[in-house]
């Protein structure tokens, strides 16, 4: 058995599969079961009671995590003129249009989030088939198509994340790093949970949040009590 699998097995044995953990308990356990070799990302997966094939049940949105993600998010902005200057001043990592499109077509996608001003969307459409499957296509619904690039860049850099349910009805998101205090992880989780619950489609029947799991990179999944609302740090 490899050292990695031994470490995973030891970590997995700390998780009681017969129970559901409160968010703060899951956050503490995620930190405890995380790799000690690097600062792992803490992820959460929601299994939702929706049918993503139906347009009115495609749960997607954005939320600003109160403590950010702990990740250095690289932002690309499709803009020209004054908007391009504003994006640069706000801290965007890559700004441009034609040169950015050319780089994308060459396979150089060195960013985590793409933002575009409305007047550039016709041009951005030329790389939609590249950006779309990667979840990088700017979209008005996520606030990434906007004339206010200063605010958009600041929001993303400050911890605003986008989420979307996938074809298997799972919704994945990052809520921080293993180095975060457990309370901060729980509060980030709570902000995400509240927004997902708020977005429950009226046509979705039965249990909405069927299953929630928190884990770190390469760490075991920790089942979370989906009935816990508010008081996430208790």
From Swiss-Prot:
Output the Pfam families linked to this UniProt entry: Ribosomal_L1
Q: What keywords are assigned to this protein?
A: Repressor, Ribonucleoprotein, Ribosomal protein, RNA-binding, rRNA-binding, Translation regulation, tRNA-binding
Q: Give disulfide pairs as residue numbers.
A: none
One GO MF annotation is: rRNA binding
Tell me the superkingdom of the source: Bacteria
**GO CC annotations?**
large ribosomal subunit
Gene Ontology biological process terms from the UniProt entry = regulation of translation; translation
Q: Does the keyword Transmembrane helix apply?
A: no
Q: Could you describe the subunit structure of this protein?
A: Part of the 50S ribosomal subunit.
Q: Which family does it belong to?
A: Belongs to the universal ribosomal protein uL1 family.
What is the recorded function of this protein according to its Swiss-Prot or TrEMBL entry? Binds directly to 23S rRNA. The L1 stalk is quite mobile in the ribosome, and is involved in E site tRNA release. Protein L1 is also a translational repressor protein, it controls the translation of the L11 operon by binding to its mRNA.
Name this polypeptide is given = Large ribosomal subunit protein uL1
Identify the gene encoding this protein.
rplA
